[in-house]
Regions:
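Conserved AMP-binding/adenylate-forming core of the ANL superfamily
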Residues: 65, 82-138, 155-160, 215, ...
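Conserved pre-ATP/AMP-binding loop-to-beta segment of ANL
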Residues: 78-80, 204-205, 211, 216-253, ...
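AMP-binding/adenylate-forming catalytic core of the ANL superfamily
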Residues: 150-176, 190, 337, 344, ...
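AMP-binding/adenylate-forming catalytic domain of the ANL superfamily
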Residues: 205, 548, 584-609, 621-644
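Gly/Ser/Thr-rich phosphate-binding loop
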Residues: 227, 315, 342-346, 355-424, ...
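Conserved AMP-binding/adenylation subdomain of ANL enzymes
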Residues: 270-290, 300-343, 357-359
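Conserved ATP/PPi-binding loop(s) of AMP-dependent carboxylate-activating enzymes
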Residues: 429-433, 444-482, 521, 622-623
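Conserved beta-loop-beta connector loops within the AMP-binding
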Residues: 437-462, 498-501, 569-571, 575, ...
């Protein structure tokens, strides 16, 4: 497969960028011609950022799975589409060709049809990182059902909230999942999530861990039994349902600055075109490259760069079930050596974690197949960038530092491997079609330069094809979250620096959202969970610098129980109890790293918590707390400083 829209020189990047901003309809219309359509569009773009309304390839008809699977069958039926490496290195890996993927997706699509799933139905997927997860996602897309994948680390309560919000009618899960040395009982977590649920008709359960599970007659079905029924029907191919360009493809829940996670909705055509375009250009993907994205499909990175983009490009995507440190810290390097991986796309958290083991685990591995390295999820610190460059890339592989979000669908700011220059710690240049602007808190463009840098809140001025379309069931929330802070701009929630060359460095969130190990967690969400613990009066959560995770979670907790402040042992028990509550309500990814018991929180006279002060204390910047005289009770700050962990 060739990619006529692949940028090959720096001059071509600048030309493409200019064309994309000056003539977005022509630019994206020309790229979209390279895909399979049932009917071409009537209009490339219709938009405003006030409602907001964003429509790409309006009137176009297609199915994304015809672009990810069917169109490759004529010439590449026997090419590996997905290579799967299991959690346990002693277990055999699996190779799924495009021909097999077509069969697997068709048969599971028929399973869904047999059980009454229709176009527009919401199907929740809660599975481990096995090929059946990708197959389930694509089978939903094939019949026009809207998939909503939930990361396997979320609790029953978190799942229940998402099922309720999406009004999901079907669930696809596994008996259990392997993650390093742990077995996660996915089906029993789903059972807990379904207590009191009235919308779910069926739960389809795929066998992975052979964990004993409860199966309810009339509701729960085994994946394998349902496939056997389809085989008995003699069905080997299912026609893809024709979708409108703007039909929803999936819902993916992400944390916001308020407590309730929001369901980000992506559409079909724009998402397909944009993820493919960024994949081919950022990584300079060649048709026979093996691409290894280490993310989980439960996050946007896995949706876009394990499933949809590599497959729409006719590429080969490596999917890994386990974690980088199991059975030892050489696992990534084993996989790269074993399969001769060409492109590695991972998170700074993983790199920092592997750095802490030293070079022993890297030694003895042949990493010479690597051509491009990438990072995603959070800004990469320079120390980790240099370690990655020297020890993994051997100073021969460009590192693409990609900035984007669940809401943007695909990569927004990044150097292109070997084409545009990289810079340690900098995401550098925006993708074609992405017009950035830095604004001050009033929404005015930052025009003053300090020490060669512009500093402000990062916004986008015009739509790109994979722009968020809405938050599921609540369009007003989409407007207020992203398009109301600064009128006619998409507000990213991130702060940034820009140099005189136009290169951008992301400095981190400017709202009440934490970035922990590359995963977004809302402070309000964690506070709500802590506050549900018996004995907790109030809490405040902030981020602080963490050597491995990038940001850690620091919780200040007012506890009424008689023994929070007495002996260390009792306080420690309460800490553990609170952590257990957070795990139950949200999941282990949201557990605070530090809990400090306090008698009060720094509040203004109007009752607002001064998080700025709490952040400074958590960061250890005790000499720059600023003016505390406006606080209701300034003495609270002294007490907090004395008890800092």
């Amino acid at each position: 497969m060739s990619y006529p829209y692949q940028i090959k020189t720096l001059e071509a990047y600048h030309e493409a960028y200019k064309n994309s901003i000056d003539h977005p309809e022509k630019f994206w219309g020309d790229i979209a011609e390279n895909f399979t359509w049932r009917k071409k569009w009537d209009k490339v773009l219709d938009w405003n950022f006030t409602e907001p309304k964003v429509e790409w390839f309006k009137g176009g008809k297609l199915n994304i799975t015809e672009n990810c699977i069917d169109r490759h069958l004529a010439k590449n039926a026997d090419k590996p589409a997905i290579i799967w490496e299991p959690n346990d290195p002693k277990e055999n890996h699996r190779i799924i060709t495009y021909k097999q993927l077509h069969l697997n997706v068709s048969q599971f699509a028929q399973v869904l049809i047999n059980n009454g799933v229709q176009k527009g139905d919401r199907v929740c997927i809660y599975m481990g990182m096995i090929p059946e997860l990708a197959i389930a996602v694509l089978a939903c897309a094939r019949i026009g059902a809207i998939h909503s994948v939930i990361f396997g680390g979320f609790s029953a309560q978190s799942i229940a909230d998402r099922l309720d919000d999406a009004k999901a009618t079907y669930i696809i899960t596994c008996d259990g999942a392997y993650r390093g040395a742990k077995d996660i009982p996915l089906k029993s977590i789903i059972d807990d999530a379904l207590v009191g649920n009235t919308t779910i008709k069926n739960v389809i359960v795929c066998t992975r861990t052979r964990t004993a599970v409860s199966m309810l007659k009339g509701r729960d079905l085994w994946w394998e039994d349902e496939i056997k029924k389809v085989e008995a029907q003699g069905i080997t191919s299912v026609d893809a349902v024709e979708m409108d360009a703007e039909d929803p493809l999936f819902i993916l829940y992400t944390s916001g600055s308020t407590g309730k996670p929001k369901g980000v909705v992506h559409s079909t055509a724009g998402y397909m075109v944009y993820t493919n375009y960024t994949f081919v250009n950022v990584f300079q993907y060649e048709p026979n490259d093996l691409f290894f994205c280490t993310a989980d499909i439960g996050w946007i990175t896995g949706h876009s760069y394990i499933v949809y983009a590599p497959l729409s490009a006719g590429g080969t995507s490596l999917m890994f079930e386990g974690i980088p440190t199991f059975p030892d810290a050489g696992r990534f390097w084993d996989i790269i050596d074993k399969f001769k991986v060409n492109i590695l796309y991972t998170a700074p958290t993983a790199i920092r974690s592997l750095m802490s083991f030293g070079l022993g685990p890297v030694e003895g591995h042949d990493l010479s197949s690597l051509k491009v390295l990438g990072t995603v999820g959070e800004p990469i610190n320079e120390e980790a960038w240099h370690w990655y460059d020297e020890n993994i890339g051997k100073k021969k592989c460009p590192i693409v530092d990609t900035w984007w979000q669940t809401e943007t669908g695909g990569i927004m700011i990044s150097n292109m491997a070997g084409i545009t220059p990289g810079k340690p710690g900098w995401a550098t240049y925006p993708m074609p079609g992405v017009q950035t602007i830095l604004v001050d808190d009033k929404g005015l463009e930052v025009t003053t330069i300090e020490e060669g840098l512009y500093r402000g809140n990062l916004c986008i001025t015009q739509p790109w094809p994979a722009t968020i379309r809405t938050t599921y069931g609540d369009h007003e929330r989409c407007r207020t979250n992203y398009f109301a802070t600064y009128p006619n701009l998409y507000f990213t929630g991130d702060g940034a620096l820009k140099n005189e060359l136009g290169q951008i460095r992301i400095t981190g969130r400017v709202d009440d959202v934490l970035n922990v190990s590359g995963h977004r967690i809302g402070t309000a969400e964690v506070e709500n969970a802590i506050n549900m613990h018996a004995g907790v009066v109030e809490s405040a959560v902030v981020g602080y610098p963490h050597d491995i995770k990038g940001q850690g979670i620091y919780a200040y907790v007012i506890y009424t129980g008689s023994h929070a402040q007495d002996t260390h042992g009792s306080a420690e028990m309460i800490r553990k109890d609170i952590l257990q509550t957070v795990t139950r309500i949200i999941g282990p990814i949201a557990k605070p790293d530090k809990i400090q018991f306090v008698s009060g929180l720094p509040k203004t006279r109007s009752g607002k918590i001064m998080r700025r002060i709490l952040r400074k204390v958590a960061e250890g910047e005790l000499n720059s707390l600023g003016d505390t005289s406006t606080l209701l009770d300034p003495a609270v700050v002294d007490e907090i400083v004395k008890g800092v962990i």
